[in-house]
Amino acid sequence: MTQDQLKQAVAQAAVDFILPKLDDKSIVGVGTGSTANCFIDALAKHKGAFDGAVASSEATAARLKGHGIPVYELNTVSDLEFYVDGADESDEHLNLIKGGGAALTREKIVAAVAKTFICIADGSKLVPVLGAFPLPVEVVPMARSHVARQLVKLGGDPVYREGVLTDNGNIIIDVHNMSITNPVELEASINAIVGVVTNGLFAARPADLLLLGTAEGVKTLTR
C-alpha cells in the first residue's frame, strides 16, 4: 500500500470508530494536515449523523465547510467527545510530536478539550524515541532570538522556519537533533521559556488511541 492509501485506511478506521457513538448533537474536533484531510473526506459522507465540527486551523475549517459540514468556534462548544488528528511522530506511549503544518497551538487546545483524542497515522510515524522529526515551537516573533538561545541550552539545534506565520500570527522554530527520552518534562521546560506559545510535544495530554496504518491493516494502540 502507498502512504496515501495507508492514510485513507486509518482515516476510514477513525470514522468507523466514532460513528456509532455520534448523534445529531455531537460535535467532532478535527486536526490539520494530509491525514486529517483524509479523515474529513471520509467523515463528510456521514455529515447527517452529527451536528458539526471544531477546526484546529483555518485550512481545516475551509475543507470542512467545503463539504457542507458546519464549523463551530470552540468557545461556543461545551462538550467535545472526539478529537481526530494526525502526527509527525508517536512513541509506544502515544506521546506525539505534532506541528509540521504549523497548527500545533490550536491542535493542542482542541485536544485538551476533547474527551477522547484519536491519533491517525501511517506506520512510519511510530518510533522508539521521539525527536528524529524536528520539534516545532510556536514563538511570539519578538522573542525569536531569546527562545532560540534557551533551546540551545536544552540541547537542541533551533532553526527558524522562514516564511511561515501561524494562524495566530506567530513564528515557528524547529528544534533539530534532540533525542526526547522524557517528553513530559521537555514539553514543560520548553513551554516555560518566556516567548514560547507552546511546543509540538503532546505528552502532558497524549493521544488516547493510535490508529496505525500498516501493510497488514490498521493496528490499534492504546495507552
Swiss-Prot record:
Any Gene Ontology CC annotation: cytosol
Assembly notes: Homodimer.
Gene name in the database record: rpiA
Gene3D superfamilies: 3.30.70.260, 3.40.50.1360
UniProt cross-references to PANTHER family, sorted A to Z: RIBOSE-5-PHOSPHATE ISOMERASE
HAMAP family with a match to the protein in the record: Rib_5P_isom_A
GO biological process assignments: D-ribose metabolic process; pentose-phosphate shunt, non-oxidative branch
Superkingdom of origin: Bacteria
EC number(s) from the headed UniProt entry: 5.3.1.6
GO molecular function ontology, one term from the record: ribose-5-phosphate isomerase activity
Record: residues binding substrate: T32, G33, S34, T35, D85, G86, A87, D88, K98, G99, G100, G101, K125
Active site: E107
Function: Catalyzes the reversible conversion of ribose-5-phosphate to ribulose 5-phosphate.
InterPro entries membership: NagB/RpiA_transferase-like (IPR037171), Ribose5P_isomerase_typA_subgr (IPR020672), Ribose5P_isomerase_type_A (IPR004788)
Pfam families: Rib_5-P_isom_A (PF06026)
Keyword line: Isomerase
NCBIfam families referenced in this protein's UniProt entry, alphabetically: PRK00702.1 (NF001924), rpiA (TIGR00021)
The family this protein is said to belong to: Belongs to the ribose 5-phosphate isomerase family.
Pathway: Carbohydrate degradation; pentose phosphate pathway; D-ribose 5-phosphate from D-ribulose 5-phosphate (non-oxidative stage): step 1/1
Protein name: Ribose-5-phosphate isomerase A
Catalytic activity annotation: aldehydo-D-ribose 5-phosphate = D-ribulose 5-phosphate
Residue spans crossing the bilayer: none
